[in-house]
From Swiss-Prot:
This is Probable leucine carboxyl methyltransferase 1. InterPro entries: LCMT1, Ppm1/Ppm2/Tcmp, SAM-dependent_MTases_sf. PANTHER family: LEUCINE CARBOXYL METHYLTRANSFERASE, LEUCINE CARBOXYL METHYLTRANSFERASE 1. One of its GO terms (cellular component) is cytosol. It is an enzyme of class 2 (transferase). One of its GO terms (molecular function) is protein C-terminal leucine carboxyl O-methyltransferase activity. Belongs to the methyltransferase superfamily. LCMT family. The keyword Ribosomal protein does not apply. S-adenosyl-L-methionine binds at R82, G107, D131, D179, L180, E206.
Amino acid sequence: MDSEAISSDSHVAAAIATRRRSNSVSDDYSVQRTNDDATQCKYFAIQKGYWKDDFIGRFANSSANVAEARRFPEISMGYWARTAAIEKYVRGFLEEFDGNAQVVSFGCGFDTLFWRLVSSDAKLAKYVEVDFSSVTSKKIRHILKPGGSVDLKKSFESEAVVSHHADLHAGNYHLIGADLRQTSELEQKLATCQLDHDIPTIFIAECVLVYMSSNTSSSLLKNLVSQFRHPAFVNYEQFRTSDAFTRVMEQNLGERGIQLHGLEMCESAEKQEERFRNAGFKSVKVMDMNQIFNQFLDQDEVARIRQIEMLDEMELLEQLLAHYCVVFARV
């Protein structure tokens, strides 16, 4: 299906637009609400069997109805590919250093990767999550609430200590509320996590940098390279942003008060590579989500995914996947 056809499909266009996590100057509250959309979409896909996550139920509203647009198979397949790709990169990084490595997730939302890693006996030195304080305070309440089939606190190496209602410290796990655009605040909050700047550290950002100005995101990347001895970065965000598909996405997000301030960096693989190399990363690999789906991820799993909800045609899925990418960079 071509860009014009996708643009006229308001259901799919709105679904793609509203499921994203990000940081926006224009309306932070609207941006933070997209975390709820993403969590419900993931929960729906997991219930359908796209992947296993025993922990998402602690954060999702099981009684809420997922909007019709976000029940499209293409949406669930996209979330699966995104989740699987990020996890594969992180697991590979941790295994490379036999667990003597740290993970820092920017714009974490209600992500559950920490618990999925620990439950599978993956070794890691420390896992830090960062988001707006309004998001982390909610996540803390979900983590600490009694009842439920899974006790998230059992994954912590020490008793959870909460400060300012928005920060949680528990040995191997830290959750802090900070605005990534505010350098001094971010550095102060990260300091409370006692990260080791001399051991390998992988940073994650899923549709986060695109909502910051290009100068702000570039400054963030440069600071990481200067402050950490062995940093790596896995970045998931929009791609090929000069067509009608992106204009429709921008329009839908704009109606929700969300602006894509860093969209210029998402135009091409060359732009992405230039951004990371200018920040000091030596190795930069960019793959769109079609490449991720058809080459990077386990093809037996891809075959299984295709069988869950059979698609009449693949053009729409391919079009959606072509407009998102994963960047993996390291020094």
